[in-house]
UniProtKB/Swiss-Prot annotation:
It comes from the Bacteria. The keyword Cell inner membrane applies. The gene is nanT. Belongs to the major facilitator superfamily. Sialate:H(+) symporter (SHS) (TC 2.A.1.12) family. Catalyzes the proton-dependent transport of sialic acid. The lineage of its organism: Bacteria, Pseudomonadati, Pseudomonadota, Gammaproteobacteria, Enterobacterales. It comes from Escherichia coli O9:H4 (strain HS). It catalyses: N-acetylneuraminate(in) + H(+)(in) = N-acetylneuraminate(out) + H(+)(out). Disulfide bonds: none annotated. Keywords: Cell inner membrane, Cell membrane, Membrane, Sugar transport, Transmembrane, Transmembrane helix, Transport. This is Sialic acid transporter NanT.
Length: 496
């Protein structure tokens, strides 16, 4: 950027169409967050009515993560072939329909299936909205685009918590899910009133349709084998998370089977760049493992361990959700200032100072607990707002939505494991200690994976001929693309 350009406030670099595109996607993500967290808010009520164990109840949260990998792949491919806008609209309709079905669910299995539908829609919304906004904004503002967008999910969670405190005590938990049908009206407005992403339009102007992940996996020479593997993965995940298996060895074998299938899909879809894709799945897996025990089970902790009433729970969750939303925006500024990976690491290190005090303070002082949660979630959860930017930078526009959606949502199975692991540990320890220990230890794993740029590093080790040296979104160099001790100037000079 020129000196003159740098002196212009960042928001003046955006025109009216770009702001409208962002606003529409942000509202869609807010509604996504609203619908998705409803189950966490009413988990104890659902558990009591259906007579579920703690692990079975936690699996209702996990269910939405089980189907996310497939939703991310299919709806991401739709976004790559037909445009980001159509994929966004389809995603909103899916998660809204699933939420309505939860309100009518007569029992555990029906609600589990409805949560699978929500997971597919959520995955599509994440991939399509993220690529839509990132590709619509100027390159030097794309960390802000990512962070600002993802803040919508946390705002949706805050709104859901407030609605919970007003609706559930009067009309019961089912009424909360009936409200979740409203986003379909918004989806119809979206279909007519927002433009397509600029990067996608430029890439596809006057050209034949691209070959998407769906084409490669389900219309190519290995389509029969891939369909069989898809069914096998879905079945294995069902048995792992539906609360039917108690044998840890069998669960481990099924988990390894799923991992092998997902790696096979990544190898087929990305060719020589498969090491990057696989490592990104690992990064996202641990990102969910450190963050989602708190996200999923915090309402249960507040209601059971601290014995808070619904109104107090809503107030504490407001601090938590608002902190995450603010953190997404702060993360966007940090990412554009320090660089995506450096901002991520610094924010997570700071969050580690707060995680133990959050669960050690107890429930005597609600306001102190709320403030601690605000800052911990701002630093620890909010920085995940720039994760779509981080992942998307490793891939070109042609496959970005599908690969981002698939990579992110396979890794998001950590979110399915997290509440169950937290619930299992809580059978031996109190829930607060379980949540704190999980989050504290696994955050360090994410710090190492991102700080060392392991996706680029493993790519360089295994398939160096396909190594990408610079971010495809903002053009900045990847630190892991060069060995330790190599001159960074060499990387800047050899930009390809």
């Amino acid at each position: 950027m020129s000196t003159t350009t740098q002196n212009i406030p960042w928001y003046r670099h955006l025109n009216r169409a770009q702001w409208r595109a962002f606003s529409a996607a942000w509202l869609g993500y807010l509604l996504d967050g609203f619908d998705f967290v409803l189950i966490a808010l009413v988990l104890t009520e659902v558990q009591g009515e259906f007579g579920l164990t703690t692990v079975q109840a936690a699996s209702l949260i996990s269910a939405a993560f089980i189907s996310r990998w497939f939703g991310g792949l299919m709806l991401g491919a739709m976004g790559d072939r037909y445009g980001r806008r159509l994929a966004m609209v389809t995603s909103i309709v899916l998660f809204s329909a699933g939420t309505l079905a939860c309100g009518f669910a007569p029992g555990y299995i029906t609600m589990f299936i409805a949560r699978l539908v929500i997971g597919m829609g959520m995955a599509g919304e994440y991939g399509s909205s993220a690529t839509y906004v990132i590709e619509s904004w100027p390159k030097h503002l794309r960390n802000k685009a990512s962070g600002f967008l993802i803040s919508g999910f946390s705002v949706g969670a805050v709104v859901a918590a407030q609605v919970y405190s007003l609706v559930v005590p009067v009309w019961g938990w089912r009424a909360l899910f009936f409200i979740g049908i409203l986003p379909i009206i918004f989806a119809l407005w979206l279909r007519k009133n927002i433009p397509e992403a600029e990067d996608w339009k430029e890439k596809h102007a006057g050209k034949a349709p691209v070959r998407t992940m769906v084409d490669i996996l389900y219309r190519g020479e290995h389509r029969i084998a891939n369909i069989v593997m898809t069914l096998a993965a879905a079945t294995a995940l069902w048995f792992c998370f539906a609360g039917n298996l108690q044998n840890a060895a069998i669960v481990a074998v099924l988990g390894l089977l799923c991992a092998a299938i997902f790696i096979s899909f990544m190898v087929q879809s990305t060719g020589k760049r498969w090491p990057t894709g696989v490592m990104l799945m690992v990064v996202v897996l641990f990102a969910f493992l450190y963050s989602w025990p708190i996200q999923a089970l915090l309402p249960t902790y507040l209601k059971t361990d601290l014995a808070y009433n619904p109104h107090t729970v809503a107030n504490v969750l407001f601090f938590s959700g608002f902190g995450a939303a603010v953190g997404c925006c702060v993360g966007g500024f940090l990412g554009d200032w320090l660089g995506t990976r450096k901002a991520y690491v610094c924010s997570l290190l700071a969050s580690q100072l707060l995680i133990i005090p959050v669960f050690a303070i107890g429930g005597a002082n609600v306001w102190v607990l709320g403030l601690l949660l605000f800052f911990q979630q701002m630093l620890g959860q909010g920085i995940a707002g720039i994760l779509p930017k981080l992942i998307g930078g490793y891939f070109d526009t042609d496959q970005r939505a599908a690969v981002l959606g698939f990579t992110y949502n396979v890794g998001a199975l950590g979110g399915a494991l997290a509440p169950i692991i937290g619930a299992l540990i809580a059978q031996r320890l109190d829930l607060g200690t379980a949540l704190a220990s999980l989050s504290f230890s696994l955050t360090f794993v994410v710090i190492l994976l991102i700080g060392l740029d392991m996706p680029s590093r493993v790519q360089r080790w295994l398939r160096p001929e396909a190594l990408r040296t610079h971010d495809a979104i903002d053009g900045k160099p990847f630190s892991g693309a060069v060995p330790f001790g190599s001159a960074k100037n060499d990387l800047v000079k050899t930009k390809s």
